[in-house]
Amino acid sequence: MTPLTKHQVFEIIGHLEPEIRALGVSRLAVFGSVVRGESGPDSDVDVLVQFLPGSKTFERFLALSDLLEAKLGRRVELVTTEALSPFFGSHILAEAQDAIRAA
């Protein structure tokens, strides 16, 4: 499997924006090896997600994860802004690049 580039990931997510927004997502950002240009053939895609108030449910979280994995063809590590580690959260926020921004 060839590594995904940041451009490819953002292009795929861009095409999925209507479906992603329909799940109540207000912000979707990519971080980690893909953003740094260090992803390998077996790398996952690290994604930070923020839902609209009252829209975050377990079912929507899983649906988003499944959608991204199916379309990216890779495992996706999906993390919500609320679940960020106090130790690594600031690093992730600094590195994250928005693919979908709040409207």
Regions found by a protein language model. Give the residues of each.
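Catalytic core of pol beta-like nucleotidyltransferases
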Residues: 1-27, 35-41, 52-103
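Conserved histidines in hydrophobic membrane contexts and catalytic metal-binding motifs
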Residues: 30
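Short hydrophobic/aromatic beta-strand micro-patches
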Residues: 48-50
